[in-house]
């Protein structure tokens, strides 16, 4: 009897999804504390946005878009003397607005479309505070730039990945910046001999005693932001963590440079002669 080619033929055998699901009591495996997960970055993905970037770091996937500059709300303020370099005075400097959201399917448990609440607002504020030192807001008087970060999959170090992707999106949008911002996350293993792990996975974060996110402007060699939580022990322990995070940021910087160069070449090739 001839087969019915109009239908999609499924596999002859199937397995229940529980067979491949991770156990809830799974513990992180031992690994090199200085290793970085493989990173993939691409800028200029969204044609509707002024600038955009997509970043994968291990199992973490983030998409960022930049819009503006547009006139800020309440932007009709008085004028003042111009600052150095043709920038507007401090009272007229532009504003950077950052929004961080998680997709409903980003974690192991599905979230409500408007879920997240205070945690997402806190991460959005941390994103804004780390990006502001790198953006020349004085060149955009009475204007605002909007950065939207969407976490598609949370595989660990979500804030660090969002920071890096947002900086790429700002650069892709042609926003004037002093430097890029590179983010790196760390987690402290519990136990009698705690160790800081660079670029932890979601599982390592869940089993950690403390966490830290470092944001660096690598060319200027200036720290743009720090966000820590948990019990990290002595001050020397946190100092070692910051140093390890800064080294990780410097190692990631060449990947971001190549990403922006490739995006510029694609844009140049697509431009009409």
Swiss-Prot record:
Coiled coil: none
Superkingdom as given in the UniProt entry: Eukaryota
Any one GO molecular-function label of the UniProt entry: RNA binding
Single GO BP term: isotype switching
SUPFAM superfamilies in alphabetical order: Ribonuclease PH domain 2-like, Ribosomal protein S5 domain 2-like
Keywords: Cytoplasm, Exosome, Nucleus, RNA-binding, rRNA processing
GO cellular component: cytoplasmic exosome (RNase complex); cytosol; exosome (RNase complex); nuclear exosome (RNase complex); nucleolar exosome (RNase complex); nucleolus; nucleus
Keyword Nucleus appears in the UniProt entry: yes
One Pfam family named in its UniProt record: RNase_PH
Main location class: cytoplasm
Residue stretches spanning the membrane: none
Annotated spans, Disordered: 1-36
Subcellular location: Cytoplasm; Nucleus, Nucleolus; Nucleus
Function: Non-catalytic component of the RNA exosome complex which has 3'->5' exoribonuclease activity and participates in a multitude of cellular RNA processing and degradation events. In the nucleus, the RNA exosome complex is involved in proper maturation of stable RNA species such as rRNA, snRNA and snoRNA, in the elimination of RNA processing by-products and non-coding 'pervasive' transcripts, such as antisense RNA species and promoter-upstream transcripts (PROMPTs), and of mRNAs with processing defects, thereby limiting or excluding their export to the cytoplasm.
Sequence similarity: Belongs to the RNase PH family.
Subunit structure: Component of the RNA exosome core complex (Exo-9), composed of EXOSC1, EXOSC2, EXOSC3, EXOSC4, EXOSC5, EXOSC6, EXOSC7, EXOSC8 and EXOSC9; within the complex interacts with EXOSC1, EXOSC7 and EXOSC8. The catalytically inactive RNA exosome core complex (Exo-9) associates with the catalytic subunit EXOSC10/RRP6. Exo-9 may associate with DIS3 to form the nucleolar exosome complex, or DIS3L to form the cytoplasmic exosome complex.
Name the record gives this protein: Exosome complex component MTR3
Organism of derivation: Mus musculus
């Amino acid at each position: 009897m001839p087969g019915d080619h109009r239908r999609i033929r499924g596999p002859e055998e199937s397995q229940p999804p529980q067979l491949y699901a991770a156990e809830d009591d799974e513990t992180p495996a031992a690994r090199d504390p200085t290793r970085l997960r493989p990173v993939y970055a691409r800028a200029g993905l969204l044609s509707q946005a002024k600038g955009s970037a997509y970043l994968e770091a291990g199992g973490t996937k983030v998409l960022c878009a930049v819009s503006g500059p547009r006139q800020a709300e309440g932007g009709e303020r008085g004028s003042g003397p111009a600052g150095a370099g043709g920038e507007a005075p401090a009272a007229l400097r532009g504003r950077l607005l950052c929004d961080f959201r998680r997709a409903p399917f980003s974690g192991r448990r599905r979230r409500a479309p408007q879920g997240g609440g205070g945690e997402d607002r806190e991460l959005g504020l941390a994103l804004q505070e780390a990006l502001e030192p790198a953006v020349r807001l004085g060149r955009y008087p009475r204007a605002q730039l909007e950065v939207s970060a969407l976490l598609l999959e949370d595989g660990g170090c979500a804030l660090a990945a969002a920071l890096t992707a947002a900086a790429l999106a700002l650069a892709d949008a042609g926003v004037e910046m002093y430097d890029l911002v590179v983010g790196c996350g760390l987690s402290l293993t519990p136990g009698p001999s705690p160790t800081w792990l660079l670029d932890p996975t979601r599982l390592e974060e869940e089993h950690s005693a403390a966490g830290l996110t470092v944001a660096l402007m690598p060319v200027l060699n200036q720290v743009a932001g720090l966000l820590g939580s948990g019990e990290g022990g002595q001050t020397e322990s946190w100092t070692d963590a910051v140093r390890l995070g800064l080294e990780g940021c410097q190692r990631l910087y060449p990947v971001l440079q190549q990403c922006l160069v490739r995006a510029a070449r694609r844009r140049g090739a697509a431009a009409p002669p």
